[in-house]
Amino acid sequence: MLRGFYTATAGMISQQRRMELLSNNLSNANTPGYKADQSSLRAFPEMLLSKMDATSVPTTKPLKFAQNQLIGPINTGVYVQDIAPKFSQGDMRPTGNDTDFAILNQTLPENASVFFTVENTDGTQRYTRNGNFTLDAQGYLTTNNGLYVLDENNNRIQVNASSFTLQPDGTLLVNNVPQTRLGIALANNANELIRDGNGLFRASEGQQLTNANNNPNISFQIMQGHIERSNVDSAQTMADMTSAYRAFEANQKIIQAYDMSMQKAANEIGRIN
């Protein structure tokens, strides 16, 4: 009977984790460039049950040996196997701000994605789809969290002008004179990136993504005065939250039923009236 407790509890924990993930997605529905997390549930490995029985050998003095009798497999619950961002393209929203950029995917291999490159506080590179940038007091292009946006040579971008133009290939023009080009990084398998908070991603330890500019196998463009919306589907997310709640509630009722059965077994079975 205790096995039923463990199975139902595993289901409750999995649905609670799923609900937390969906709630986080919904709270970031209006965050530019946010990529929704998605989870996958997996059943624990099945257990093969067998019954130990005794069999006798007909001799002058009967001998008994233990014999296994197959009962069958039993499931032991589920768990959240994996959580990974979904890197599908978000919708474009015009803002009219010169420092707002959005990457529009055109031709990319399956599972590949491109990102803006920024410099983290420790000097390492991070990658983001949130192009809601600004200029600091020194004229450097930064994220809203103060991280420097990098060009294709991994240098900080300083704009010594109040107005500038960004071409679709990422070239930054001041008074129609090319100054630098945005650093756009290519992840051949975006699923291998590690989420780092605040809309940032990082590559595996000691690795950097390759430069996406001038790559003949891919195509994309940078849109100035636009930001990419999050790819969270609010309606579907709310429906999934309802489903997760119902599953959590069902497992909770199973535990209550087991609890009542155990109370009855402890208090009534074997009682002499």
Regions found by a protein language model. Name each.
Residues 1-273:
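Amphipathic alpha-helical polymerization modules
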